[in-house]
From Swiss-Prot:
The keyword Nucleus does not apply. The record marks 56-57 as: Reactive bond for trypsin and chymotrypsin. The keyword Disulfide bond applies. One of its GO terms (cellular component) is extracellular region. Pfam families: Bowman-Birk_leg. This is Bowman-Birk type proteinase inhibitor C-II. Residues 1-7 form a propeptide. It comes from Glycine max (Soybean). Gene3D superfamilies: Cysteine Protease (Bromelain) Inhibitor, subunit H. Signal peptide: none annotated. The record marks 29-30 as: Reactive bond for elastase. Keywords: Disulfide bond, Protease inhibitor, Serine protease inhibitor.
């Protein structure tokens, strides 16, 4: 099965979406935890991502493949939540 993924140059964008953040972070229960961000971004990954994979579609759908021991701050502000 071909995934049709390629590495993206995520460093070319300085807009809000390039800031490291993650809305869908999943971590293992191990110590230290192994965390992955499952967010999909258009055309690039956030600025702190070392391994970015994007589909060949236009616009590209990109996901950071890095493993960290923490989750980045959420991308969406808490003001957007309906409490």
């Amino acid at each position: 099965m071909e995934l049709n993924l390629f590495k993206s140059d995520h460093s070319s964008s300085d807009d809000e979406s390039s800031k490291p953040c993650c809305d869908l972070c999943m971590c293992t229960a191990s110590m230290p935890p192994q965390c992955h961000c499952a967010d999909i971004r258009l055309n690039s990954c956030h600025s702190a991502c070392d391994r970015c994979a994007c589909t060949r579609s236009m616009p590209g759908q990109c996901r950071c493949l890095d493993t960290t021991d923490f989750c980045y701050k959420p991308c969406k502000s808490s003001d957007e939540d309906d409490d």
